[in-house]
């Protein structure tokens, strides 16, 4: 794992030692080279030889998420150039350092084999994200959003620490591999039920589950572009990853404890999709659509079949790329119109035809049109929820319909219609932006040719 962690850490001195005109080029090219390294983890003859150490290891569940994390750093750097154009050099370097340190803590979270180390890095991801939101957000409300984000996540994850200490005292180890091999079946008791809640609540807040989701729209709307991209694409996936890892230890409690949360996630999926239909703020709409997609992932993980785990991993990767792309497009609109309100940026297709094409492709990917991997993920989850209970087909089917409605509503409102009067001086789309959109879309389409890469450890 050092071959991935060490080059990422070396991005920090590279950032601070780069000259003014080279800072973007150096960080982008080096982070792109680093994003190739996780591809090596697929070619493992024997898992123990290459990727396992006492502290960090990778497996087919970790590797797709590592690919997503490393792929997104160069994209966030490319997306942030315009946002930081008026900042002094030291602030640019600090911003990039925050993004790099966030990536380091994410890589270590995904690869940690000790659960206490996993918990420490899981919490460490909060600090750079909080600094990015509260320092570089656009509106004064960013401080309120940062407070919501911090306290929701901390309150959710403190019981997890207590549960981990309890597990260590009873079993004598917190190594994930040892626990999965030696885990005993937990008897159904009040204490064990509370421990199950403590284990899963931290991840349900992070996902977020409907009812615990209030921090997410605030954080998304107030965050700068890189904050929104990392939050939607990778930080929400920490919740899914943690749940999948720890569900193996908590059997068979999940079977009867999961019912209320399954019902809540399926209900929340419909609710947040419906809320998206009534949004006027573009970033808020994308944030609520994220909650809706992650509710499907929660449902899939709680059902606990190999097919549902596969669907959850595919949907997490697909959603990470799609939501990041949508935030990039929303940011390109915001940089030109200086407004997130959709009605004020309508009719942009006549001025930016190529950007309208990216909008169309992103909207179609969001509503899971073939041949995107979003369709594979949604169909897998839909089939598993149907096999768990036939009545869920009504909910998941209507959710797919509402998703199509708000995706097309978002596209038509921003691209069609008459131009508004305040749009007088509009810059054309830059090559940097077009490359950025292409680099988001190409994995979504290419992974559908070989989805084995991202189907997780159950394939």
Curated annotation (Swiss-Prot):
Q: What is its main location?
A: mitochondrion
Sorted alphabetically, the keyword list is: Electron transport, Membrane, Mitochondrion, Mitochondrion inner membrane, NAD, Respiratory chain, Translocase, Transmembrane, Transmembrane helix, Transport, Ubiquinone
Single biological process term from Gene Ontology: mitochondrial respiratory chain complex I assembly
Pfam families to which the protein is assigned, alphabetical: Oxidored_q5_N (PF01059), Proton_antipo_M (PF00361)
The record's section on InterPro entries has:
NADH4_N, NADH_Q_OxRdtase_chainM/4, NADH_UbQ_OxRdtase, ND/Mrp_TM
Give me the reactions it catalyses: a ubiquinone + NADH + 5 H(+)(in) = a ubiquinol + NAD(+) + 4 H(+)(out)
Q: Name one GO molecular function term.
A: ubiquinone binding
Q: How does it sit in the membrane?
A: Multi-pass membrane protein
Extract one GO cellular component term from the record: respiratory chain complex I
The Enzyme Commission number assigned here is 7.1.1.2
Report the locations given in the UniProt record: Mitochondrion inner membrane
User: TM segments?
Assistant: 22-42, 60-80, 94-112, 113-133, 145-165, 196-216, 224-244, 257-277, 284-303, 308-330, 351-371, 391-411, 435-455
Q: What does this protein do?
A: Core subunit of the mitochondrial membrane respiratory chain NADH dehydrogenase (Complex I) which catalyzes electron transfer from NADH through the respiratory chain, using ubiquinone as an electron acceptor. Essential for the catalytic activity and assembly of complex I.
Family of this protein: Belongs to the complex I subunit 4 family.
How this chain assembles, per its entry, is: Core subunit of respiratory chain NADH dehydrogenase (Complex I) which is composed of 45 different subunits.
Supply the name of the protein.
NADH-ubiquinone oxidoreductase chain 4
Species of origin reads Gorilla gorilla gorilla (Western lowland gorilla)
């Amino acid at each position: 794992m050092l071959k991935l962690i060490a080059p990422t850490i070396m991005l920090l001195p590279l950032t601070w030692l780069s000259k003014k005109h080279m800072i973007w080029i150096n960080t982008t090219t080096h982070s792109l080279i680093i994003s190739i390294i996780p591809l090596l983890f697929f070619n493992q003859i024997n898992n123990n030889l290459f990727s396992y150490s006492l502290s960090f290891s990778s497996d087919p569940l970790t590797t797709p998420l590592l690919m997503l994390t490393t792929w997104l750093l160069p994209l966030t750097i490319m997306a942030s150039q315009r946002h930081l154009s008026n900042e002094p050099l030291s602030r640019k370097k600090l911003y990039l350092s925050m993004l790099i340190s966030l990536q380091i803590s994410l890589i270590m979270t995904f690869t940690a084999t000790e659960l206490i180390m996993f918990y420490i890095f899981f919490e460490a991801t909060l600090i750079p994200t909080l600094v990015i939101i509260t320092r570089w957000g656009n509106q004064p409300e960013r401080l309120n959003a940062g407070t919501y984000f911090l306290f929701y996540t901390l309150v959710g994850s403190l019981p997890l620490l207590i549960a981990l200490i309890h597990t260590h005292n009873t079993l004598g180890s917190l190594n994930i591999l040892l626990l999965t091999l030696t885990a005993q079946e937990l008897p159904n008791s009040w204490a064990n039920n509370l421990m199950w809640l403590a284990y899963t609540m931290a991840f349900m807040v992070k996902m977020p589950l409907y009812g615990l989701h209030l921090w997410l729209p605030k954080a998304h709307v107030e965050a700068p572009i890189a904050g929104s991209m990392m939050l939607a694409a990778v930080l929400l996936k920490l919740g899914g990853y943690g749940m999948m890892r720890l569900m193996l230890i908590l059997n068979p409690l999940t079977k009867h404890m999961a019912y209320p949360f399954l019902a809540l996630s399926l209900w929340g999926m419909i609710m947040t999709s419906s809320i998206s239909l009534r949004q006027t703020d573009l970033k808020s709409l994308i944030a609520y659509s994220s909650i809706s997609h992650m509710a499907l992932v929660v449902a899939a993980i709680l059902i606990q079949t190999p097919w549902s785990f596969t669907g959850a991993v595919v949907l997490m990767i697909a959603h990470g790329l799609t939501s990041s792309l949508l935030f990039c497009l929303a940011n390109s609109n915001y940089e030109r119109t200086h407004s997130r309100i959709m009605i004020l940026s309508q009719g942009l297709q006549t001025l930016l035809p190529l950007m309208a094409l990216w909008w169309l492709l992103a909207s179609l990917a969001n509503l899971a049109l073939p041949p995107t991997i979003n369709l594979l993920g949604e169909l897998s989850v839909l089939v598993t929820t149907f096999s768990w209970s036939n009545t869920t087909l009504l909910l998941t089917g209507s959710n797919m319909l509402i998703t199509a409605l708000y995706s097309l509503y978002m596209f038509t409102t921003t691209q069609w219609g008459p131009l508004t009067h305040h749009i007088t001086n509009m810059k054309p789309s830059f090559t940097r932006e077009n490359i950025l959109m292409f680099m988001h879309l190409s994995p979504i389409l290419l992974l559908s040719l070989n989805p084995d890469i991202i189907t997780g450890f159950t394939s």
